[in-house]
Amino acid sequence: MRRVAKLSAACAATAALALTATACGSTSSDNNASPSSSGGAKGGIKIGLAYDVGGRGDRSFNDSAARGSDKAAKEFGGSIKELTAKTSDTEADREQRLSDLAQAGYNPIVAVGFSYAPAVTKIAKQFPKTNFGIVDSVVNASNVDSITFTEEQGSYLAGVAAALKTKKDHVGFIGGVDVPLIKKFEAGYVQGVHDTNPKIKVDTQYLSHGSDFSGFASPDKGKAAAQGMLDNGADVIYSAAGSSGNGAIEAVSGTKGAWAIGVDSDQYNIPGLAKYKNSILTSMVKNVDVGVYDFIKSVHDGKPLAGLNAYSLAKNGVSLATSGGFINDIQPKLDAAKQKIVSGQIKVKTTP
């Protein structure tokens, strides 16, 4: 869940994304380091991964980034150094994190989340021979790969699914933090719902606002928000809220006939959510792992990607998960909606 914004050295980003950290293997450091996985022999590619709040283990966005780096390390040999942010981080903290990785010889370095955009803009200039990748923002520099996604398109399909599955003509959307990136998820979802059935009521709630990024890493807040919507009559709830969405899924699982829609990863198949999987209708999968892997591979191959690389619905950058078979009966309608988006017949909004 994140905003794409063109930034120059004078620009500033506004938010952080939720993530959580665990792994196997390992190197670590004092800069809020999480354990890091390693693959292959010493002397291989050295991958630096800078997570935002939470890091590896969020069962969502950051875990998807981790899968991409893990795959690359295993395939090409080498190691991964992972550093994770805190909710109290300043811009200087993010800059220091990237600088530490670059000074230690990690190349490429992946910054996970748009809050790193100003830091990448600055540090990439200081280390012109190091290749940087940033997820969910655009930084204009010759040594930066901007990895973006059309979240609104995938969320539109989630809205279609919600509209076709609700029994009460009442659904909900939970956003982690009230920032432009998450507004893309909301906009696509609401449009998908109303294009399918304009009579359906959509409840919307954001868990935090402004510079308070706790909404991306507070499962208790997600659970409370979802429970409020369920009590108010909603029976399908889509969350774009990092690990806070795990709490929403838990709440939905306690209500017979209600559905949760996951985000970023195929949450039906996440071990930590296994006991709730029969309440997960689908997930709006954002293939961050593909973008991260493609970037690392390009550096390994000596042809580093740079500039804007957008992963759209047409390129399978976003999609709806089919695990569990709960949307099999509506798949033809979802496929039809997808084709209309890909062909340009449907223009999906990026703001509510």
Model-found features: residue ranges?
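Core hydrophobic alpha-helical transmembrane segments of single-pass membrane proteins
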Residues: 13-17
